[in-house]
Amino acid sequence: MSQSRYFFTSESVSEGHPDKVSDQISDAVLDEFIRQDPDSRVACETFVTTGQVIVGGEVTTKGVVDVQTIARKVITEIGYTKGEYMFDAHSCGVLSALHSQSPDINRGVDRKEEISDELDRVGAGDQGMMFGYACTETPELMPAALQFAQQLVKKLAEIRKEGKIMTYLRPDAKSQVTLEYVDEQVKRVDAVVVSTQHDPEPEGVSEAEWQAVIKKDIIENVINVVIPAALLDEKTKLHINPTGRFVIGGPHGDTGLTGRKIIVDTYGGAAPHGGGAFSGKDPSKVDRSAAYASRHVAKNIVAAGLADKCTVQVSYAIGVAQPVSIYINTHGTAKHGLTDAEIQEKAEVIFDLRPASIIKRFGLNKPEGWCYQETAAYGHFGRENFPWERTEKVEELKKALNVA
């Protein structure tokens, strides 16, 4: 019997990537609005470029937020603190263009007087479809290529912030991992790409010599630490700063915008995406809250041993609390003789996917032990401190489906 063999690739970017700088500022602004007023309605977009930050969007809130202070704090935490970066927390301009939300939208989302059931009083903030996914490739029940890619850039940031080794590192970085699969199982890492911003070569050191130092350091201190040795072999291709010099980066090298890294934020291309970004959006926006809830459903189904893979789609109409549709696909991996229809029937009963129920279940308007800014770099999923990663519905699912 012939084996099925294929390659699959996912990428990630560091917290210093310009689009991620934007995401983190947007979510930090959201965090402060939510802290002051848990019922805030926020749609916050951020634009960053050479020496400039613009924060705009629509807000309905009782809170008052100092956008300048928040933006500079985030930029400082990321590490853009030197004038030579041409984007510096202390000297960049910060313009706030936040304004009030359309009352037409607000009327459809908050309907307190009209409806008796409080969980039906919050309608979806917009129409759209959202996806959740889980698989058995990693302990976090996430796709392996994405997890490795996220860990590579996260490790780079940790090394940079510790400041003990590789002191030439600057905040902007990207990673990409290609895995080889045989019969649906990860066999090996076929290729790794790491591009990191760095200081100019020291005086008397050629560009080629400097890149050789950087390549050696990244292989030893990043790739070999993150990627299991059993998955690396002599055929694995390692591309470190493949274009060579990477001194100019961050918002000076490329303009950043909120919501442009939606595949990095989710499943690395292993699952569909409804198209709606997360950062800067309060939890009444189902682009965010329903994507979190869909991951929760998929993860509990896989954690319960009902399937090895699970994709969940949910869709909404603006102003309507109940989902328009729910769809579950286990990609032929369902176990115990179960069908997708049987799993879906029970899941629809066990998981309440009305926006108000999602917000209440995960504490999305009163985060405890986490904040939205944390989600804005290194992925919204596969990180155990987020409440939508809990697997507390496993036993209920198994009981409902008569699975031991």
UniProtKB/Swiss-Prot annotation:
Chain sites annotated for binding ATP: 17, 172-174, 245-246, 254, 260-261, 277, 281
Flexible loop as annotated region, ranges: 101-111
Catalyses which reaction(s): L-methionine + ATP + H2O = S-adenosyl-L-methionine + phosphate + diphosphate
Ligand binding (L-methionine): 58, 101, 254, 285
GO biological process entries: one-carbon metabolic process; S-adenosylmethionine biosynthetic process
Spans annotated as Disordered: 1-21
Class of the enzyme per the UniProt entry, highest EC level: transferase
Record's function text: Catalyzes the formation of S-adenosylmethionine (AdoMet) from methionine and ATP. The overall synthetic reaction is composed of two sequential steps, AdoMet formation and the subsequent tripolyphosphate hydrolysis which occurs prior to release of AdoMet from the enzyme.
Name the UniProt record assigns to this protein: S-adenosylmethionine synthase
Source organism of this protein record: Chlorobium phaeobacteroides (strain DSM 266 / SMG 266 / 2430)
Record gene name: metK
